[in-house]
UniProtKB/Swiss-Prot annotation:
The keyword Cell wall biogenesis/degradation does not apply. This is Omega-amidase NIT2. Has omega-amidase activity. The role of omega-amidase is to remove potentially toxic intermediates by converting 2-oxoglutaramate and 2-oxosuccinamate to biologically useful 2-oxoglutarate and oxaloacetate, respectively. The gene is NIT2. The active site is at 43 (proton acceptor), 112 (proton donor), 152 (nucleophile). Keywords: Acetylation, Cytoplasm, Hydrolase, Phosphoprotein. The keyword Cytoplasm applies. It is an enzyme of class 3 (hydrolase). Its EC number is 3.5.1.3. It catalyses: 2-oxoglutaramate + H2O = 2-oxoglutarate + NH4(+); 2-oxosuccinamate + H2O = oxaloacetate + NH4(+). Belongs to the carbon-nitrogen hydrolase superfamily. NIT1/NIT2 family. Disulfide bonds: none annotated.
Amino acid sequence: MASFRLALIQLQISSINSDNVTRACSFIREAATQGAKIVSLPECFNSPYGTKYFPEYAEKIPGESTQKLSEVAKECSIYLIGGSIPEEDAGKLYNTCAVFGPDGTLLAKYRKIHLFDIDVPGKITFQESKTLSPGDSFCTFDTYCRVGLGICYDMRFAELAQIYAQRGCQLLVYPGAFNLTTGPAHWELLQRGRAVDNQVYVATASPARDDKASYVAWGHSTVVNPWGEVLAKAGTEEAIVYSDIDLKKLAEIRQQIPVFRQKRSDLYAVEMKKP
């Protein structure tokens, strides 16, 4: 398939888990009726975002929320990137994305490897590591193209995107919830940088903005092409963002500016230490 439609669901998150899941499934169905073949939910789609919420809302995978995602992926015959949920496993908590195929099978599970610990004086202090543990593995899976997964803060680490490109990824998806400090400064910049550096499509799915929340998400779910152009971008409100992923266009860009062939592997390397 030379091109396919991607949909990003910028969901308004409430404190009621079941409502979040039900509404997410409704938007997934709507996206499928509009021709989306791959659909992504935002980071922490089933719960408020915050260290005090992660233990309360944590689930096993498979579990109640991911079972609903499996069912709707099969119903709609789509690839579904399940944003992320707080996952509990063996006494530890993770920020985890589950991916489902068109037959409802669990294709992949990715645990955020770079935890969001920052301190910007007078602006924001946040430590995911207070309650979460980091993952320790990469995640790629095959759809109409090969997809690489990261979650939010992972996008700041160029090495992750480079390794995904080396592994043949043509689309990188980052469910994420930047904030009102980092969002306006870095959200689009990082996406365009990752896209141009690695000649890939980059997509981000954010929660919709809720100014009354303890953590206010930036919103602006986005799709960027390998030329660094913004193809589609939401505002701050609840929305579905659609974009056609053109693999022929990607191949043309890689042929026109052949950086992969021109890398000086005799002088430098970015390598994967662990599969």
